[in-house]
Amino acid sequence: MKEFLAVGEIINTHGIKGEVKVYPLTDDMKRFKKLKEVFIDGEEKKILSCKLQPNNVVLKIEGIDSIEEANKYRKKLLEIKRENSVKLPKGSYFIADLIECRVIDEDGREIGQISDVIKTGSNDVYEVKGKSEVLVPAIKDIVTNIDIENKTVTIKPLEIWQCE
């Protein structure tokens, strides 16, 4: 499992004093209010202030004191140590842990690897790339087992649930 988890991406500058606008990669933006530090390119940075906006977060990060400096951080990921992440309820997983999981069906046939997790509102959908691309709804009727340690996701055979 990855030691660091991405919680946001710097998408723009905000103002002239070095604040950055962050697109959250977490389900709960309020978590940013509790963050004391993040890692950018592996370097620890202290968070000095946090303002929540409807779809973004504005952060003042130590060492970023001008719009020019803030501009250098565009498209950079903000990461936290896994040990500082929220504790997930049983049956929930971090997207970072699902990416690159091998997907097999209950008969042992290789389907491919999870390349992305699409958030749809009602349920997640796993984008699985193999011989072809398959979109797998992440629901209990289809996904029968997730083994993060062994990077394996087991699903019901495609012919049972997939329309031709």
Curated annotation (Swiss-Prot):
UniProt keyword annotation of DNA-binding present: no
Predominant subcellular localization, coarse grouping: cytoplasm
Coiled coil: none
All residue ranges annotated as the PRC barrel domain in the record: 90-161
InterPro entries associated with the record: PRC_barrel-like_sf, PRC_RimM, RimM, RimM_N, RimM_N_sf, Transl_B-barrel_sf
Function (record text): An accessory protein needed during the final step in the assembly of 30S ribosomal subunit, possibly for assembly of the head region. Essential for efficient processing of 16S rRNA. May be needed both before and after RbfA during the maturation of 16S rRNA. It has affinity for free ribosomal 30S subunits but not for 70S ribosomes.
Annotated domain remarks: The PRC barrel domain binds ribosomal protein uS19.
Protein name per its UniProtKB record: Ribosome maturation factor RimM
Organism: Clostridium botulinum (strain ATCC 19397 / Type A)
